[in-house]
Regions:
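Periplasmic/cell-envelope proteins involved in peptidoglycan metabolism and beta-lactam response
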Residues: 1-297, 321, 395-405, 527-529, ...
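Beta-lactam-recognizing serine transpeptidase/beta-lactamase-like catalytic domain environment
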Residues: 7, 69, 210-223, 236, ...
Length: 610
């Protein structure tokens, strides 16, 4: 009986052993056949480490080859990919990087390539690099990676044209807004950095290393070198840009401190070549330092931008929509000449108001008497142009506004351009659901009412006048250059198109604008320049405060090479608020070409660093 029980126990034990063996065998088969790839990756991950070599972004040069944007050497902190991480490691990283653990986990989850380390934070400052190095013995899966850092050496200079870069977001990756991009990469977020990102970004390289359990490198494998991004050569003139920005800031401060315009804190200035549309300078105030975004903008700097009522991040040259004021009289005059509604020397009487709408007259109630076109434009007389508006009619004013480029985007190579608005019966019906009145036509004729324009649109209109009737698409990038200096391509642009306005009409407009800057005109101080300039003042009504001041000009009159448009928000009269900035642009332009001496070229004083 006892032997039988012993045999039974042995049989039971044997069955249990067989079952256990079968389970182990099944598990082994499962791991080998179904989970083999996974554990092979885990094993390789423990000894193989792949890292990206970030491609340096292309350099951005001014028209003369001066570096406006370049790269500096820097560091990023990356995390070796593995199946799980110790909570204390993540917490240590969180404390070091000032990054929530949840954000670190989100980056880990977003990473798809098992062999590629996870980028946690780039553009580290030296203090952060030192702290991480000191803590690495507790975190062997954490590494420092050398990478290029985007650098804007002149800080705010031309920031609204150049833009800035930042780390690509999960949303941008999910939406496919950037091609061939991975988490942790830097991409253009605004300006030319964004428009030409696919050229500037280049192609990242990679290298593979074998490491031991402590993370020490024991073997190097062949690497794939990065391909640098393409370079951009701009049309921007560094010297003109620098002088315009400095003087604009100085002049705005003067307008405020003198009490002339206490609220003058915002402005837009653009200078272009009327012969082809090349932008020579672009200023929008207030501005900001794009370097703030490279290292991850601090809450202090972000609040200083975000809470500023003058919107520093808006490029007012292309997004600001303002009534064109008296600068629009160029359009009204052109329509009247083209439709034979007025003669060049035909006198029209200004008795201080228009008899058909007695409540509408000149600023300050001025009475200028009998006027012909040239004097009316030079004196910026309202009553004269009310009469032209009455003769022409709103439909024709609308037609010629579109001919000169209003109400449509210019096509400049920057994102976010506004279309503006052209006054019309349809627009009033859509906005106010009201019928059109004669007073609306009078307002439209002098650039008020429903008319809205951007400074870049005004520069296109003025270029048409300056060059004799051709409308060009404005642009900032002259050419895209390979890293070896050879030409990659010229950006495609629309060819210049001659507008449907006669040369005679263009000549009449030019005569009136030339008189504006001569004795008796509203901007006679321009007569002090070595070559004659043609200009037009403007005052744009502003329902939220003091009127905006505008000034537009081109020169030299005989052979125009430069068009300048300026608007100073809440600056008051254009001749006082905006005119001096335009004057400075031409002064710098003439000094560069040797037409007048440059004061700062005198012999330097002792102890002066040149």
């Amino acid at each position: 009986m006892e032997d039988r029980n012993r045999i039974t126990r042995l049989h039971t034990l044997l069955v249990v052993c067989l079952v256990l063996f079968a389970v182990l065998l099944g598990r082994m088969v499962y791991l080998q056949l179904w989970r083999g790839d996974y554990y092979a990756k885990q094993s390789d991950g423990n000894r193989l480490r792949q890292s990206r070599i970030l491609a340096p972004r292309g350099i951005i040069y001014d028209s003369e080859g001066k570096e406006l944007v370049n790269n500096l050497p820097g560091y990023a902190v990356v995390l070796q990919k593995q199946s799980s991480y110790k909570p204390e490691t993540l917490q240590r990283l969180s404390n070091l990087l000032q990054m929530p653990v949840e954000e670190i986990n989100a980056k880990i989850k977003a990473s798809e390539n098992f062999y590629e380390p996870i980028m946690l934070k780039n553009n580290l400052d030296q203090q952060m690099v030192t702290k991480i190095e000191e803590q690495r013995r507790y975190m062997p899966e954490v590494m420092l990676s050398v990478q290029p850092i985007r650098n804007y050496p002149y800080h705010e200079l031309a920031v609204h044209a150049l833009g800035y870069v930042g780390e690509v977001s999960s949303y941008e990756i999910e939406q496919g807004l950037f091609k061939n991009i991975t988490q942790g990469s830097l991409v253009g977020k605004a300006g030319l950095e964004k428009t030409y990102d696919k050229y500037l970004r280049g192609e990242d390289g990679a290298f593979m290393e074998e490491v031991d359990v402590a993370g020490n490198v024991v073997k190097h494998y062949d690497s794939v070198q990065p391909i640098p991004g393409k370079n951009l050569k701009l049309t921007i003139d560094y010297e003109l840009q620098k002088e315009l920005e400095a003087f604009t800031d100085k002049h705005l401060a003067f307008l405020r401190s003198s009490g002339i315009a206490p609220g003058a804190r915002a402005a837009a200035v653009v200078a272009i070549d009327p012969r082809n549309g090349a932008v020579r300078a672009m200023v929008s105030r207030p501005g900001y330092d794009p370097n703030w975004f490279v290292h991850g903008i601090s809450s202090k700097n972000w609040n200083s931008i975000n809470n500023d009522p003058n919107y520093p991040m808006n490029n007012k040259v292309i997004t600001g929509e303002y009534p064109p004021g008296s600068t629009f009289k160029i359009v009204t005059g052109s329509a009247a000449f083209e439709l034979k509604k007025v003669g060049l020397n035909e006198p029209i009487f200004d008795g201080g108001f228009h008899p058909m709408v007695p409540t509408m007259g000149n600023a300050g109630g001025e009475v200028l008497g009998w006027l012909t076109f040239i004097k009316a434009l030079a004196m910026s007389d309202n009553v004269y142009f009310y009469e032209l508006g009455y003769r022409v009619g709103i439909d024709n004013i609308e037609k010629y506004a579109h001919i000169f480029g209003f109400g449509e985007r210019t096509g400049i190579d920057l994102e976010g351009e506004s279309k503006g608005l052209v006054a019309s019966k349809k627009v009033k019906r859509e906005i106010w659901n009201e019928d059109w009145r004669l007073g609306d036509t009078f307002n439209a004729a002098i650039g008020q009412g429903f008319n809205l324009t951007t400074p870049i649109q005004l520069s296109v209109m003025l270029s048409i006048v300056a060059n004799g009737g051709t409308k060009y698409q404005p642009y900032l990038v002259d050419s895209i250059i390979n890293s070896d200096g050879s030409l990659f391509e010229k950006p495609k642009r629309a060819e210049g198109k001659h507008i449907d306005v006669s040369q005679q009409t263009i000549d009449y407009i030019r005569m009136g604008m030339s008189a504006t800057t001569q004795e008796g005109g509203t901007a006679s101080y321009f007569a002090g320049l070595p070559k004659p300039i043609a200009g037009k003042t403007g005052t744009a009504e502003n329902s939220h405060g003091r009127d905006h001041g505008l000034f537009v000009a081109y020169g030299p009159v005989d052979d125009p090479e430069l068009v300048v448009v300026c608007i100073v928000e809440q600056g008051g009269f254009g001749s006082v608020a905006a005119g001096p900035i335009v004057y400075k642009a031409f002064e710098e332009f003439f000094q560069e070409r040797g037409y007048m001496p440059r004061p700062d070229k005198a012999a330097p004083k002792k102890d002066t660093i040149q």
